[in-house]
């Protein structure tokens, strides 16, 4: 009885967080409910796994979303739309053979579904494209990247030697973690290129622009003055 009450409490909290769009906190509550649900309650475990999967998908936690979708499928609680989401997660994660297998099942069940048909083509062609390589040379810029989210870069300056971007790295203002993403709120950072072409370590913009709340993608006027 106590275990059942604990499960219900986590589920109610999870649903509340979910209604607020706080997917990270919702996933955490659903995970605790899933862990406490006995293995013999297959239907309940499958339903909770599905809730977890959808939350993880929202916050771009692809490997966790895949694992949760697999459990939902294993417990026969995933609809065709859920299996489509699972197949697309596999494709996104580079698991092309497994994605192709899932998309084939979906095309057989939903022959008119454009997403399923396009997904199957993508899963078949992606390994070929990957093997052929790209005309572009891409390399990781360690000076810009952190272990958190770094996004929305904007170049500024006559020589485009100033790079502004948003980051949720540890140096961002505030101490609280977002219930949506599980990371700190985003701040705007700046890196500058010197005369030797070397970029500086990014630093948070001063002057009171950054706060403990989210400072999203920045933008500039065409003349770069504002």
What do the PLM-derived regions correspond to, one by one?
Residues 20, 58, 82-85, 92-226:
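Short, conserved micro-motifs composed of acidic
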Residues 3-22, 37:
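Bacterial Sec signal peptide processing site at the extreme N-terminus
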Residues 32-35, 71-74, 107-108:
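Conserved structural position within tetratricopeptide repeats
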